[in-house]
């Protein structure tokens, strides 16, 4: 706030708001990220601070990597390109947000078109 500039980048999931059976804890935690993003983006805009959410799909690390090969294939088959994302896709989105002073309260999907 003292610098009158900042970027808040929250991470969520492109599946996080679907609300499938058995995902109450996961879904509510992801929706909480969306809610706090909305508040931050409005409260801190006057300080030139923006807040956005990256909605990630299947990337070959984290939760995806811990899944069985069969489950990974099942998830990848839902992606139109049939492949997982690369970390450079996330880096590119972060760079875009950092350099954009008018992108605020946005939810940017990086999920291969899910």
Where are these regions (language model features)?
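C-terminal substrate-recognition "lid" of short-chain dehydrogenase/reductases
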Residues: 5, 83-110
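Residue(s) in the substrate-gating loop at a strand-loop-helix junction
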Residues: 13
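Conserved SDR Rossmann-fold cofactor-binding beta-strand/turn motif
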Residues: 50-60, 109-111
């Amino acid at each position: 706030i003292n610098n009158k500039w900042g970027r808040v980048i929250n991470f969520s999931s492109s599946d996080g708001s679907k609300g499938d059976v058995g995902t109450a804890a996961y879904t509510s935690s992801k929706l909480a990220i969306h809610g706090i993003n909305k508040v931050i983006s409005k409260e801190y805009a006057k300080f030139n601070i923006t807040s956005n959410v990256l909605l990630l799909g299947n990337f070959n690390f984290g939760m995806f990597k811990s899944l069985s090969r069969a489950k990974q294939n099942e998830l990848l088959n839902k992606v139109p390109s049939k492949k997982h994302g690369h970390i450079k896709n996330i880096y590119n989105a972060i760079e875009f947000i950092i350099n954009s002073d008018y992108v605020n309260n946005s939810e940017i999907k990086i999920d291969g078109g899910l």
